[in-house]
């Protein structure tokens, strides 16, 4: 049996060309995330941040999570991870008061500890986890084969 675990390098809003930011989303999408897994990820991220004396990240169960779920569904449809249309998500959150936005994505991990450890062993993902952010939204979902896809959006308010 072959297992595929993938993480994609993170995206920070400074690296993205601006797109049209006139974007609406159904916040009910946030309800579709696997909140048990998402909460475990957030706990692990905050444990790591606290060990460094960094501020605890607050969970955003509305807009950031709705954008994250939408992106996770998009990745599931393509069967690959990516940061496509990140600037749209970033600009939409900035329209709602965020000053900076970044995201980490992954697929194939079956436990929160595994995906967070993978991100922490990647310098670009680790820099997002340790970044100057205050809130995080989650799109944690399984495809029809039971494989997990992850989008974690970080932002500073």
Over which residues does each language-model region extend?
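A short alpha-helix/helix-coil micro-patch that ends at or immediately precedes a cysteine
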Residues: 17-76
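Extracytoplasmic/secreted envelope proteins and their assembly/folding machinery
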Residues: 38-46, 65, 69-72, 102, ...
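Short, surface-exposed glycine/acidic/tryptophan-bearing loops
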Residues: 65-115
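Surface-exposed patches in mature extracellular/periplasmic domains of secreted proteins
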Residues: 51-65, 79-90, 126-141
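Bacterial signal peptide processing site
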Residues: 10-14
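Disulfide-stabilized extracellular recognition modules
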Residues: 51, 106-157
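C-terminal motif of bacterial Sec signal peptides marking the signal peptidase cleavage site
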Residues: 5-9
């Amino acid at each position: 049996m072959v297992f595929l675990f993938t993480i994609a390098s993170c995206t920070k809003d400074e690296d993205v060309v601006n797109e049209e930011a006139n974007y609406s989303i159904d916040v009910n999408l946030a309800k579709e995330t696997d909140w048990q897994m998402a909460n475990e990820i957030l706990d692990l991220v905050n444990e790591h941040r606290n060990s460094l004396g960094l501020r605890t990240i607050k969970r955003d169960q509305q807009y950031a999570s709705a954008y994250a779920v939408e992106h996770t569904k998009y990745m599931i449809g393509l069967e690959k991870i990516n940061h496509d249309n990140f600037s749209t998500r970033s600009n939409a959150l900035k329209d709602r008061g965020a000053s900076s936005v970044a995201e980490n994505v992954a697929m194939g991990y079956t436990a929160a500890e595994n995906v967070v450890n993978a991100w922490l062993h990647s310098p670009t993902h680790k820099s997002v986890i340790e970044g100057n952010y205050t809130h995080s939204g989650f799109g944690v979902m399984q495809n029809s084969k039971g494989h997990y896809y992850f989008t974690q959006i970080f932002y500073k308010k």
